[in-house]
Amino acid sequence: LLVCAAASLNITEPGSTGIGGDMFCLFYDAKTKKVHSLNGSGRYPGAATLEEVRQKLNIDPGADASMPFLSALAATTPGAAAGWVDTVEKFGSGKLSLEQILQPAIEMGENGFPVSELSSRSVSFGYLLLWTIMPGG
């Protein structure tokens, strides 16, 4: 259910969640009474160093700074989709395949769905933001 809901939100609320993002899961196993966690966050290049990133961003060594939101250097490899697969494999009942779990979201994507005003504004803003960052595509 969790993976189906997440995939459905990727279709219906792309400004709030997305397959290009991260995913985290806490799972309570009623049989063992234990909580398990899953980290589906993206990874940054393993060879990258803080010094290298600061140099590329023209930030002096030791200076108090933050990563610019619109910088390509702020991106990580998306981890959500792999996290969904891991969630189904590790915590699923085994009664449904990943394809069956994702089917409702696939159908929404193929057949359409009512778009909320919030989603409409978010998509419009995202389009304008991308156009500003990458004029002409």
Model region roles, listed by residue range:
Residues 2-137:
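Noncatalytic scaffold domains of N-terminal-nucleophile
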